[in-house]
Amino acid sequence: MDEKDLATQPEEAGQDPRLPGPHEDPRRQEGVEAEKAEGPLAPHPQGERLSQPPPAAGGKLLSLKGDRAFQRLRQGRMGRGRFLNVKWLPASELRVGIVVSKKVGKAVVRNRIKRRLREILRRLHLPKAHLLVIASPEAREATYAELFQDLIRALKKSGLIQ
C-alpha cells in the first residue's frame, strides 16, 4: 500500500469518499426527482399500488390464551359451516382463537389457513366476544373466498352477526 492511498485530511462527519454524492451519480437522470414513499403502500415504479389499503377495521387481532378460555367456549353458542365451525361467548373485548388440527395437513397448509382466517376476521367488524374458529380437514382445499363465505355463514348461524 502506498502513502498516496492514505487520506491525509480528516473526513467530515457524514461523508464517505467512496460513495458519490446525491447529484454525482452518472446513472441518475437529470430533472428526475425520487418519488416520496407513503408508508407501506409506496407507489410502484410504474405508478400502480402493490396492494389495497387495509380497511378501517384494521389492526392486530387479540388472541385467546390459556386453557380456561378455550374450556369456557365449549359452553358458547355454535355455528357450523362447510369448512369451519365457530363458537363464541360475549366478552368485554374481541379475542380470537383459531384451531387447525394436524388432520388438515402439514404445517405449511395449516399456517396458510390460519393466516387467511386471521385476515378475514381482521377485515370484519365483529362485536366484542371471545371467538373460536375451528377448521375442518376440508378447509385444506378451500380458497380465500370460500373461507370468507363459510365464516360469514357460520357466524350468522351462531347469532354473532346478522
From Swiss-Prot:
Residues 21-38 have a biased composition (Basic and acidic residues). It catalyses: Endonucleolytic cleavage of RNA, removing 5'-extranucleotides from tRNA precursor. The keyword RNA-binding applies. GO terms for cellular component: ribonuclease P complex. SUPFAM superfamilies: Ribosomal protein S5 domain 2-like (SSF54211). Keywords: Endonuclease, Hydrolase, Nuclease, RNA-binding, tRNA processing. Signal peptide: none annotated. GO terms for molecular function: 3'-tRNA processing endoribonuclease activity; ribonuclease P activity; tRNA binding. GO terms for biological process: tRNA 5'-leader removal. Its EC number is 3.1.26.5. Gene3D superfamilies: 3.30.230.10. It holds the Pfam family Ribonuclease_P. Residues 1-63 are annotated as: Disordered. InterPro entries: Ribosomal_Su5_D2-typ_SF, Ribsml_uS5_D2-typ_fold_subgr, RNase_P, RNase_P_CS. Consists of a catalytic RNA component (M1 or rnpB) and a protein subunit. Belongs to the RnpA family. RNaseP catalyzes the removal of the 5'-leader sequence from pre-tRNA to produce the mature 5'-terminus. It can also cleave other RNA substrates such as 4.5S RNA. The protein component plays an auxiliary but essential role in vivo by binding to the 5'-leader sequence and broadening the substrate specificity of the ribozyme. The open reading frame (ORF) for this protein entirely encompasses the ORF for the 50S ribosomal protein L34 (rpmH). The two start codons are separated by four nucleotides. This is Ribonuclease P protein component. It comes from Thermus scotoductus. The gene is rnpA.
